[in-house]
Amino acid sequence: MTDHELHFFNIVAPEWDSRDTLSKPEIIDRLLTLGGVKECDSILDLGTGTGVLLPYLARRVGACGSITAVDLSEGMLTLAKAKAVTLVPHPQFLQTDFEAQRLPGMYDHIIMYCVYPHLEHPVKTLRRLRRENLQPGGNILIAFPTEASRINAIHHRVRVDHHYLPSPRELTTYLRAHHLPARVLADDAQLYLVAVGG
């Protein structure tokens, strides 16, 4: 993430949730079901933002599970922490650039929700996360609450056209060409979901 992007996310953090009309409960529940997230799982939520996934993750993994939420934006993390005050399990929060810094721990699932186009080195980052942070049999879930064309239109409106999101099929082909085992779990108007690993 560039300094310009970080500044943008810090500025828009207070109004982010009111702008996000796509992250509906039924879509997030479907994401977690298709992604295989279950009770007692350990979750690494990369680019947690304002923590939109956290209540759903906590309900899904329960008290025997664990959640680590990572974001570089202090503004976003402040809101995520406020959202998580009563959650069980209580998430552990890390403010760091996960592309530049190694992360501790091993996880059943690593989730990148609305994150992939912001990665500067996606293949390198996914390889490292899979090698260093993903439990055997686990998945890295790349997800969006709508189709790629709509995400690209949003990025065009806010003048970040270089943040292009390929279709799930295109992304899967690209990742496989770089020796990352990827498969499409959902590709429709309500959910974009690609799994890496497993």
Named regions from a protein language model:
Residues 124-136:
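A short glycine-rich, Lys/Arg-flanked "PGG" loop and its adjoining helix->strand segment in the class I
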Residues 44, 50-100:
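Class I SAM-dependent methyltransferase SAM/SAH-binding core
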Residues 109-122:
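A short SAM/SAH-binding and catalytic strip from SAM-dependent methyltransferases
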Residues 137-145:
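Conserved beta-strand signature within the Rossmann-like core of class I S-adenosyl-L-methionine
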Residues 180, 186-198:
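Core SAM-dependent methyltransferase catalytic element
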Residues 99-110:
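A short acidic, Gly/Pro-enriched loop at the edge of an enzyme's catalytic core
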